[in-house]
Amino acid sequence: MRILVTGGAGFIGSHTVVELQQAGYDVVVLDNLCNASEKVIPRVEAITGKKVPFYKADILDREALEEIFSKEQIDAVIHFAGLKAVGESVQKPWEYYENNIAGTLTLVDVMRKHGVKSIIFSSSATVYGNPAFVPITEECPKGQCTNLSLIHI
């Protein structure tokens, strides 16, 4: 199975890539590097001993996504790409909505066109506001909403 990890050069994404490769999956990474460094890719390759196809691209770039899905024959997606700073999401709400919502919709549309039906979407603990209990589970009631948490609900 060939899995595309969006945001795969970020902290959580790169660790997920390592785990997937060590579990025997073929992994392709897409990241625009706005919150990550390309230096992560050789480090992942050193840990796993496997080459990682890397694309510096944005999830808003439909043409780039089409090319990646066509070239790499993607079977599933793990979606970590997105802007994530709560404070900045208040200062730049449009940028966050465009990137996190429109970008995700673009990704899902390209998946649909290529017959890819499996996606794991990484949400955010911000949807719980001040949690009613810890550790947080999916049953925890949703809390006060910020721009960032609204995007992830």
Report residues per predicted region.
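N-terminal Rossmann-like NAD(P)+-binding domain of SDR-like oxidoreductases, especially those catalyzing
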Residues: 1-151
